[in-house]
Amino acid sequence: MTQNPGKFIVIEGLEGAGKSSAITLVHDFIEKHTGMAPVCTREPGGTPLAEKIRDLVKNAEPGDPLCDEAECLLFYAARAQLVANVIKPSLASGRWVLGDRHNLSSIAYQGGGRGLMSLVKTISDATLGGFKPDLTLYLDIDPLLGLERAARRGALDRIEQQEIDFFHRARATFLAQARDDSSIVVIDASKPLNEVHKDILACLSTAL
């Protein structure tokens, strides 16, 4: 008997949008829906190599700032490893995969935020070849509100410390991508948490 492939669901959003609580909610929904907990991934990260890259991009060496192009390439190196060694094998075995960020983050942050859209498209095509999530939930929030929330969690990492205009550009790119791709659903993350979660569950029930 041929194994039915699993589905790949991704949670996206700016810093402070509430991804962590959304991931817990979606995890429980998938487990109830399928009878099995999903394979959970994060980007960058999710494999031994990708976790080392995560540390590099989040905590650059003092005196050796990470240039935008190197940052972009590192994200895609981590993603390629994760897709090849974890995501695709899990889906092929029938497991569902729940991702904390995926390619849309690079499109928004490196493409929109850094102005490297041409490079992002080239590397994305080369490393992913059209592979994409079945459903992406983008938690939309004003960058100022999101960063205020993130700051309350503790010290901000290198990317969270970017100038505010960077996040405005990233947000605009997230929203533009959602307008052009029906598999990306925008969730208003500025609402009270219980309302955000109701919207997420309604979306999952409709889409899946």
Curated annotation (Swiss-Prot):
Keywords: ATP-binding, Kinase, Nucleotide biosynthesis, Nucleotide-binding, Transferase. It is an enzyme of class 2 (transferase). ATP binds at residues 13-20. Pfam families: Thymidylate_kin (PF02223). It catalyses: dTMP + ATP = dTDP + ADP. Its EC number is 2.7.4.9. It comes from the Bacteria. GO terms for biological process: dTDP biosynthetic process; dTTP biosynthetic process; dUDP biosynthetic process. Gene3D superfamilies: P-loop containing nucleotide triphosphate hydrolases. GO terms for molecular function: ATP binding; dTMP kinase activity. The keyword Kinase applies. InterPro entries: P-loop_NTPase (IPR027417), Thymidylate_kin-like_dom (IPR039430), Thymidylate_kin_CS (IPR018095), Thymidylate_kinase (IPR018094). GO terms for cellular component: cytosol. CDD domains: TMPK. The keyword Nucleotide-binding applies. Phosphorylation of dTMP to form dTDP in both de novo and salvage pathways of dTTP synthesis. PANTHER family: THYMIDYLATE KINASE (PTHR10344), UMP-CMP KINASE 2, MITOCHONDRIAL (PTHR10344:SF4). Belongs to the thymidylate kinase family. This is Thymidylate kinase. It comes from Shewanella amazonensis (strain ATCC BAA-1098 / SB2B). The lineage of its organism: Bacteria, Pseudomonadati, Pseudomonadota, Gammaproteobacteria, Alteromonadales.
